[in-house]
């Protein structure tokens, strides 16, 4: 922990205050004794003498967690934001890693937690009028595929689709992974944007997914041997594919008779029964995405766009029919693609 209370009630911040290690200190939340530590590996911090009576700090912090909290606090201060590190929120009975401008809670999550606990903490923030952003440490970084827990850290915007935030203590940067999609193998495909600690306004960086910007896109990685992959999944009785095969069989169809083009598009937006951080209805996005690629003539190529791309195409021509619809569709699609590709 980076904050401790002196016997006179004053709060000390180990990031910016001069601390006398001989003084007595208390945890601001549970008021139990803590000691000041300063070593070669861990940055200067406070630690409970005993955690058994504290319900707010359940385990000793890692060096990564301490360093990232300190880095964000310094960045927020440099950005002239009103910021508290380890802000105790009595009504919530929890501590926010950082509280920016009194309403934005930044949670640095370096270790795994249950989806139930994540939802409880997220809901608690929202019910009390706070906006919470979860920033992920190394153990929770998105790599080849999304876990169920990582899906509950996803956010959504029209400009960047599904996205999440990562913190890199070694590289000293905040990372935005966005336009996150999944292919038929269950692998994640996405773009990455990095922001060095301390450069620019912290809140401006965190608002990136909602700022006005040029639309971006990327070419999906497709499996040219998708039919062989599906056969293998059925041979090994993979539950997901066995379920789909059963559904098709009931309809008089069969996965084994499909061609590669039948599996187009191979890359789709992330799906889940629910999302912990997303509250808007995503049905229009899913429908527009599906309709766009269903209409595509080239089944050998899939370019992925942000949700606003599909929304703009369908916004004015979705209900039109016949030749007029086709002309408008082609003209609007070409114009949007030119804007994206900078042609």
Regions found by a protein language model. Name each.
Residues 40, 90-91, 117:
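Short secondary-structure boundary/capping elements
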């Amino acid at each position: 922990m980076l904050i401790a209370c002196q016997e006179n009630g004053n709060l000390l911040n180990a990031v910016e205050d001069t601390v006398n290690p001989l003084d007595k200190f208390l945890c601001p939340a549970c008021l139990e004794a803590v000691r000041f530590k300063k070593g070669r590996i861990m940055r200067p911090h406070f630690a409970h003498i005993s955690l058994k009576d504290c319900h707010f700090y359940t385990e000793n912090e890692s060096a990564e967690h301490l360093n990232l909290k300190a880095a964000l606090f310094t960045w927020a201060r440099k950005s002239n934001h009103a910021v508290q590190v380890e802000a105790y929120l009595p009504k919530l009975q929890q501590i926010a890693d950082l509280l920016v401008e009194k309403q934005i809670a930044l949670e640095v999550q370096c270790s795994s937690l249950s989806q139930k606990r994540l939802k409880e903490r997220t809901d608690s923030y929202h019910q009390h009028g706070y906006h919470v952003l979860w920033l992920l440490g190394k153990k929770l970084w998105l790599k080849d595929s999304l876990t169920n827990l990582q899906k509950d850290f996803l956010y959504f915007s029209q400009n960047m689709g599904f996205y999440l935030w990562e913190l890199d203590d070694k590289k000293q940067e905040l990372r935005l992974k966005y336009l996150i999609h999944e292919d038929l193998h269950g692998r994640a495909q996405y773009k990455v944007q990095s922001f060095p600690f301390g450069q620019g306004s912290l809140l401006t960086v965190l608002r990136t997914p909602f700022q006005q910007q040029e639309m971006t896109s990327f070419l999906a990685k497709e499996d040219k041997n998708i039919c062989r992959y599906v056969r293998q999944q059925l041979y090994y009785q993979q539950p997901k594919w066995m379920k789909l095969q059963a559904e098709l069989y009931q309809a008089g169809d069969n996965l084994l008779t499909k061609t590669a083009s039948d599996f187009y598009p191979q890359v789709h937006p992330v799906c889940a029964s629910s999302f912990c951080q997303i509250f808007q209805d995503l049905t229009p996005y899913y429908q527009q995405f599906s309709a766009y690629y269903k209409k595509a003539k080239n089944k050998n190529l899939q370019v992925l766009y942000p949700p606003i791309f599909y929304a703009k195409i369908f916004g004015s021509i979705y209900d039109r029919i016949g030749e007029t619809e086709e002309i408008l569709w082609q003209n609007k699609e070409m114009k949007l693609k030119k804007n994206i590709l900078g042609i």
